[in-house]
Regions:
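Short, small-residue-biased leader/transition segments that mark boundaries at the very start
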Residues: 1-3
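Conserved residues at the C-terminal ends of beta-strands
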Residues: 12, 31, 80-81
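Short, electropositive alpha-helical surface patch
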Residues: 26-28, 32, 93-96
Length: 147
């Protein structure tokens, strides 16, 4: 395991396996309008429906917004954007990111690395855990796959 604290920030659209590698960290923050997934909504729409113009629909189904991923425990924080968006006021956006990083790194630096590693491990063990099996799993378990 990595023996230092790791903090990542998704600034815009992270839509690839390479982007997902940035998520292997102690804390993952996203700008409030950022997207984070293994594939872009446009790419998913192209594959699923052979129609890239359905990217908004794909985005909604994929649940890859900062708010969605905070709910799922993938993201740990959402960094607010200025009223005009991240690119509308770069100074304010930079300040918001800096405040998050300073606060997070200060908190992490107070912890023993063994505790950080255990927390990181626990965080990733919780991602993707569901309390109820899906309808498809229930049908398959009952032997009714064709219903």
């Amino acid at each position: 395991m990595c023996s230092s604290d790791l903090v990542s920030v998704v600034l815009g659209e992270g839509g690839s396996g390479g982007a997902l590698a940035l998520g292997v960290c102690d804390d993952l923050a996203m700008l409030e309008n950022a997207l984070y997934s293994v594939i872009s909504p446009r790419g998913a729409a192209s594959i699923l429906w052979k129609d890239a113009s359905r990217e908004q629909e794909a985005c909604e189904i994929m649940r890859i917004t900062a708010q969605d991923l905070l709910e799922f425990g993938v993201a740990d924080a959402i960094i607010p954007e200025p009223e005009d968006g991240a690119q509308g006021d770069l100074d304010k956006m930079s300040q918001n990111i800096k405040e998050y990083l300073v606060k997070t790194i200060a908190a992490k630096s107070q912890k023993d690395i063994d505790i950080l590693q255990k927390e990181r491990y626990t965080k990733f063990r919780k991602i993707g855990v569901f309390s109820e099996p899906s309808h498809e799993v229930q049908k398959a378990a009952a032997g009714n796959e064709n219903e």
